[in-house]
Each structure stands twice: as C-alpha cells, then as structure tokens.
Amino acid sequence: SLEGNPATVEPKDVVLYGFGRIGRILARLIIGQSGLGRGLNLKAIVVRKSSDGDLEKRASLLRRDSIHGPFAGTISVDDANEAIIANGNFIKVIYASSPAEVDYTAYGINNALVIDNTGKWRDAEGLAQHLKCPGVARVVLTAPSKGEMKNVVYGVNHTDILDEDKIISAASCTTNAITPVLKVLDDKYKVINGHVETVHSFTND
C-alpha cells in the first residue's frame, strides 16, 4: 500500500518488472512516497537492454510524461553501477530476458514485491516464475488476470487478500474506473444488473 502510519509500516523492497508507461508512473508514485514511511522502496527495475545509451533513454522517459508533466525532482544516471538515481533513491537497472535470469539477493533485495507491468504473463503459472527468483516474496500483475487469480481493486475488495495469496492482479483500468462507483451505488441502493461501456485506447488485449 502507498498509505500507512510511518510508525507501523515496515519497508518493503519493490521491483518493477518492465518499465513501460505503467512502470514509469508506478516509479513516480513510489519515489514520491519514499521517506514518508509509506512502506515501499523501489530497489530495481528489470528490462531487456535495447541499445547503447539505454540507461539515459529510460531516465529521460521517466523525467517526462505528456499527461503528468515533468518529474518532481532530480534524475541522474549512474553508468558505472547501471542505475538510475531519482531524488536520491538508488534504483538498480537489471538487464534480463526472463525471470529465471535474476537473483535479486545478489543486489541486496530481499522479500520483495515484484510488480509485473509487462503484460507478458497474465495467469498464475506464468507469473509464478517470479516467485522462483531468490529474494521475491509476492507478485502483483498490472493487468486483468486469467484463471482463478484474484483481481483486486483497492477500496473495494482489498480485504479479500489473504496471506497465502502470493500472486494477485490489480485488475483492468475499466474495472478500477467503474467498480468504486458501483460499490457506492450497491452499498446504498443495491445494483441488480447493469451495462457498462468503455472507450479504450488501442491495446493488444
């Protein structure tokens, strides 16, 4: 959670597996909460190396966003240690083509929450690859899941998460948009049935 009492929330290592737009927005949110006792520390991002100057390109994309504007703070690149420094936070950039290639404990990362924002795997079997990596405790998918995995919308059904749930989905953007509204209506009036339409950007879903 990005919320909590600074006196009671134990810091949790976070790894972003993938660094597309969703990953970069998540990075901004987590970095913005660092030092406030919110409990999440962004320790690393995992990506495939694209070309020379990869670190600077990724740092540049983190600095700028057409909707949210410029990054609030400073971002620099540490080429020698393959890292991005954002507001003083050292974020290791790990280059790998699959989860099996990564040992997070080698980077001082333990009991980590991996947030998979690649969309490559959307079922428990695929996402379970992360749990086999040393240093990983839990996995969150930033897309609607397939199969029996829980789709969780914070504020609606987050209390359904059990300690044994090692992999969960943060549900779809449409689900996150409409479910809180439907919950308010259902709590007050009861929803018998309904129809929802969404205008969506082009994706490969």
Predicted regions: what is each one?
Residues 1-203:
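N-terminal Rossmann-like NAD(P) cofactor-binding subdomain of oxidoreductases
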